[in-house]
Amino acid sequence: EEDEKDDYPGLECELKGLYQTKNTRTLLTAIPELRKAGYNLSEQAVRSGFAHVCELTGLMGRWQKLQDAPTLICDTGHNVGGITYITEQLKQQSYRKLHMIIGMVNDKDIHGVLALLPQEAEYYFTKASVRRALPESELAQLASEAGLQGNCYPDVPSAVRTAQEKSLPEDFIFVGGSSFI
């Protein structure tokens, strides 16, 4: 099977993260089919779309770097599939200490997600301001059962602020667990 990415050497994608390789392949596979259906997609349009996808779509939070020193990354991965990619990506980072700010909604596979998260991190359990948000105390209890330790914060800004205050420049802060965080 021919790799469609070969048709676009040096293709730059604004979205980062290991899972984007698979997403890129899927999109590039669809382009010839879209052309057959009458869509006029030039190579330049494809390259521009990949390079500026966040600006063009408003998409945020896909392994999005918000800060350096300490590195602060957010990702909207919120299920076992997404968290699997995120934990692989975290293993490839270098840092002194990992700070994980996690919040989830109550209708996801919380046990499955928590089982995948790194145990050596310091956790900041929080919740989004949506009705389906799992209370941070419940999340912390479930996380403790999965071997994850940390403290509770009533909202995302206070969790982020505390993690930043406790971090050194060579640390890594991750924010995720829900699209609403």
Q: Where do the PLM segments sit?
A:
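C-terminal helical cap/extension that packs against the catalytic core
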Residues: T71-C74, V80, H111-F172
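Short hydrophobic segments within beta-strands
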Residues: I101-G103, T126, G176
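Peripheral docking tails and interdomain loops at the edges
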Residues: D171-I181
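Nucleotide phosphate-binding/pyrophosphate-handling subdomain across enzymes
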Residues: E4-E122
